[in-house]
Amino acid sequence: MSVDAATVRRIAHLARIAVTEDEVPHLQGELNAMLAFVEQLSEVDVDGVEPMTSVTPMQMKKRADVVNDGEIADQVVANAPSTEDHFFLVPKVVE
């Protein structure tokens, strides 16, 4: 696959990036180089290779999905200048 100058301009327009006419040939070369690299990756034989999500073996820590109050309501409102029943009190701004 090859990217032409019109495609570079269209990509720039869709991405809302201002690109001058002088920059188009350089960006065209950069995009073509990226696509060539992706094409090389598609040629790699990965038969029998297990998919992985990380380069280091790890297991996700699981916890019970339990609803609680966080047990820190007092700490949260401690920084507020004025509170009532664990709610922040603010001055009335609309009549």
UniProtKB/Swiss-Prot annotation:
UniProt KW Signal keyword: no
GO biological process: glutaminyl-tRNAGln biosynthesis via transamidation; regulation of translational fidelity; translation
UniProt key word Ubl conjugation: no
Top EC class of this enzyme: ligase
Keywords assigned: ATP-binding, Ligase, Nucleotide-binding, Protein biosynthesis
Enzyme Commission (EC) number: 6.3.5.-
GO-annotated molecular function: asparaginyl-tRNA synthase (glutamine-hydrolyzing) activity; ATP binding; glutaminyl-tRNA synthase (glutamine-hydrolyzing) activity
Catalytic activity: L-glutamyl-tRNA(Gln) + L-glutamine + ATP + H2O = L-glutaminyl-tRNA(Gln) + L-glutamate + ADP + phosphate + H(+); L-aspartyl-tRNA(Asn) + L-glutamine + ATP + H2O = L-asparaginyl-tRNA(Asn) + L-glutamate + ADP + phosphate + 2 H(+)
One Pfam family from the record: GatC
Quaternary structure and interacting proteins, as annotated: Heterotrimer of A, B and C subunits.
HAMAP family attached to this UniProt entry: GatC
NCBIfam families: gatC (TIGR00135)
Free-text function comment from the UniProt entry: Allows the formation of correctly charged Asn-tRNA(Asn) or Gln-tRNA(Gln) through the transamidation of misacylated Asp-tRNA(Asn) or Glu-tRNA(Gln) in organisms which lack either or both of asparaginyl-tRNA or glutaminyl-tRNA synthetases. The reaction takes place in the presence of glutamine and ATP through an activated phospho-Asp-tRNA(Asn) or phospho-Glu-tRNA(Gln).
Protein family according to the UniProt entry: Belongs to the GatC family.
This protein's name: Aspartyl/glutamyl-tRNA(Asn/Gln) amidotransferase subunit C
Gene: gatC
